[in-house]
Regions:
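Residue-level hotspots at or immediately adjacent to binding/recognition sites across diverse folds
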Residues: 14, 18-19, 25-372
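N-terminal secretory signal peptides that target proteins for export/translocation
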Residues: 1-14
């Protein structure tokens, strides 16, 4: 990846403590010994992943720290599905279907199998990529004309959805079983998958008689309505871990709220950041750590949530260069590494009528350097 900017952040079991020294193109050694004074802390190393022109857009990472997304790499600004690792720090392009001018990787497992979508002359379609087989087109549901893959598990099974005259429909693809439609809740006319775990449990959203609902499809083929938070009318599940814990958002008269759903406790609200008006949970790892975004008075801020600490603003621990703020955290792996998106703080940029164009988004990798 291009110009690397690294900073150290601290989180205690309570409030974030602040910035550790250093902004450089290389790792700096300045370290303030806060841990002894303030108790157990989590330290993060923050690495800027993007080049500053918006050409690189990381989306997911596996438990080995390999990152997938898309990158404009053909000299014409055409986005291509890409992965980054220690051997390919500048990115390895996966290509696309014949004639494609767009492809994007949206999931990777720990064996390096990657899934995503690429367009053709007629439509966008899902793919699987392997080191041996390269990029291969996946089928969609009968009668559908386009589709997108969203996640892949350790077995190489893929959660996806396709669309046609009957609307969007979630499905699960496997090498042994091919395409299997996941169905909808009673009265629903569409469904979308967003994530799956190693037990082939799929999290997503389905229409229903009561409106859009967060749904969990279990391996037995049943679709389970996860409900909403009290008083709300719609919900959507965005991620699931290997314990079957699901996160997403519920929406009603009081706005959008991040939720965690577990088999034992059902759906519980995760709250909002101080002064905020809404929140949404975007990812969860196998330890139950949740990341996402919460709207505040100064715009969206990325958060991390743990049961022992509650919701913490990632920006309380660091002031990133040039007025940049972390606006959402959208992926987290077993090691606690977090992918976050950055943008310009309102206080760090010119008014709208003084700017020629909005600043391109930035992406960051937050790597814990000690156990929480």
């Amino acid at each position: 990846m291009s110009s690397i900017i690294r900073k150290r952040l601290f989180f205690t079991s309570g409030r974030p403590l602040g910035l550790i020294l250093g902004l450089s193109l290389v790792l700096v050694s300045g370290l303030i010994p806060m841990r002894g004074l303030f108790g157990q802390s989590t330290t993060y190393l923050v690495t800027e992943l993007t080049s500053g022109d918006g050409a690189q857009v990381p989306s997911k990472l596996n438990n080995l720290g390999v990152i997938v997304g898309r990158q404009a790499g053909d000299g014409k600004g055409v986005p291509q599905a890409t992965f980054w690792n220690h051997s390919h720090s500048n990115g390895k392009h996966l290509g696309g279907f014949a004639g494609a001018d767009y492809s994007s990787a949206t999931g990777i497992n720990d064996t390096g199998e990657i899934t995503g979508s690429s367009n053709t002359e007629a439509a966008i379609l899902p793919f699987i990529w392997t080191e041996k087989g390269g990029l291969q087109r996946l089928p969609v549901l009968p009668g559908d004309t386009c589709g997108q893959a969203v996640a892949i598990n350790k077995h190489g099974d893929i959660a996806a959805y396709s669309s046609g005259s009957n609307g969007a429909r979630a499905f699960l693809w496997s090498r042994k079983g091919g395409v299997r439609e996941l169905g909808t809740l009673a009265g629903g006319n569409y469904s979308k998958a967003h994530d799956l775990n190693d037990s082939d449990e799929v999290a997503g959203v389905s229409g229903s008689l009561a409106g859009d609902r967060a749904v969990l499809w279990t391996k037995d083929g049943n679709a389970h309505d996860l409900g909403t938070l009290p008083g709300d009318f719609v919900s959507e599940a965005l991620a699931i871990n290997n314990a079957g814990e699901v996160v997403g958002y519920s929406k009603g008269p009081n706005g959008m709220r991040a939720f965690l759903w577990t088999k034992s406790n059902g759906m519980e609200e995760l709250g909002i950041l101080a002064g905020g008006s809404s929140s949404r949970a975007l990812a969860i790892n196998d330890s139950g750590t949740v990341v996402g975004a919460s709207a505040t008075q100064s715009g969206d801020h990325a958060f991390v949530w743990k049961r022992q600490t509650g919701m913490l603003d990632l920006n309380d621990a660091a002031s990133l260069a040039h007025g940049t703020v972390l606006v959402d955290a959208h992926a987290i792996n077993r090691k606690g590494e977090i992918l976050a998106m950055g943008g310009m703080d309102h206080g760090g940029m010119a008014p709208d009528n003084h700017r020629c164009a909005p600043a391109p988004p930035l992406s960051f990798l937050l790597t814990p350097t000690n156990a929480p």
